[in-house]
Amino acid sequence: MSKVYDWFEERLEIQAIADDITSKYVPPHVNIFYCLGGITLTCFLVQVATGFAMTFYYRPTVTEAFASVQYIMTEANFGWLIRSVHRWSASMMVLMMILHVFRVYLTGGFKKPRELTWVTGVVLAVLTASFGVTGYSLPWDQIGYWAVKIVTGVPDAIPVIGSPLVELLRGSASVGQSTLTRFYSLHTFVLPLLTAVFMLMHFLMIRKQGISGPL
């Protein structure tokens, strides 16, 4: 076993990586409120796991979406628990994200040289809100349908580009199958991928610059 470790150590410098991860300086002023970002990340990971589990049963069609959600809740093994955890962690993620933004703002964590960390955080906040909008529609019940109709109709007030933008969001002139397909693709592929990329950037900058000092 030692020879195997030495082989990898010689090529990858595993010990140096481990030392960098475990020996990072933590300022003495850090308290429990500095854990809000980490809790948000944990909620995101729970979302990914539970969301992936539900894709085995969910059917993104206007005729079968609601019935598939009902199947998850009433017949699939532990489906009710998985979907409930997904919903609870979604609410928790939004709450923790908001509190995290307030904490960073109130402690001046957005100031030089951490402006880009703040920018990526704002992008992540927008992505989190987008998760809520797209996920809300997926059961395709009355609440989800009318929420999508209202949200996608908002850009219609923009001069010139409003109507084309609405049609782009809906996939057609009215809310229907194309809209659900778009929102499902955004919720399960586009948004998670963008969130993972911006989270990686966010954490790498935090690792590089460290935690901001007290005011």
Swiss-Prot record:
Q: List the disulfide bonds.
A: none
Q: Which UniProt keywords apply?
A: Chloroplast, Electron transport, Heme, Iron, Membrane, Metal-binding, Photosynthesis, Plastid, Thylakoid, Transmembrane, Transmembrane helix, Transport
Species assigned in the record? Oenothera elata subsp. hookeri (Hooker's evening primrose)
Where along the chain is heme b 2 bound? H86, H187
Which InterPro entries does the UniProt record give? Cyt_b/b6_N, Cyt_B6_PetB, Cytb/b6-like_sf, Cytochrome_b_N_euk/bac, Di-haem_cyt_TM
Spell out the molecular function terms from Gene Ontology: electron transporter, transferring electrons within cytochrome b6/f complex of photosystem II activity; metal ion binding; oxidoreductase activity
- Extract the SUPFAM superfamilies matched here: Transmembrane di-heme cytochromes
Q: Which residues bind heme b 1?
A: H100, H202
Q: What does this protein do?
A: Component of the cytochrome b6-f complex, which mediates electron transfer between photosystem II (PSII) and photosystem I (PSI), cyclic electron flow around PSI, and state transitions.
Q: Where in the cell is it found?
A: Plastid, Chloroplast thylakoid membrane
The membrane topology noted for this protein in its Swiss-Prot or TrEMBL record is: Multi-pass membrane protein
Required co-factor?
heme b; heme c
Database matches in HAMAP family: Cytb6_f_cytb6
- BP term (GO), one: respiratory electron transport chain
Q: What is its main location?
A: plastid
**What is the official name of this protein in its record?**
Cytochrome b6
Q: Which family does it belong to?
A: Belongs to the cytochrome b family. PetB subfamily.
Query: Per the annotation, how and in what number is the cofactor bound?
Result: Binds 2 heme b groups non-covalently with two histidine residues as axial ligands. Binds one heme group covalently by a single cysteine link with no axial amino acid ligand. This heme was named heme ci.
What further fact does the record state? Heme 1 (or BH or b566) is high-potential and absorbs at about 566 nm, and heme 2 (or BL or b562) is low-potential and absorbs at about 562 nm.
Task: Give TM segment ranges.
Answer: 32-52, 90-110, 116-136, 186-206
- The residues the record assigns to binding heme c are C35
Q: Name one GO cellular component term.
A: chloroplast thylakoid membrane
Binding partners and assembly: The 4 large subunits of the cytochrome b6-f complex are cytochrome b6, subunit IV (17 kDa polypeptide, PetD), cytochrome f and the Rieske protein, while the 4 small subunits are PetG, PetL, PetM and PetN. The complex functions as a dimer.
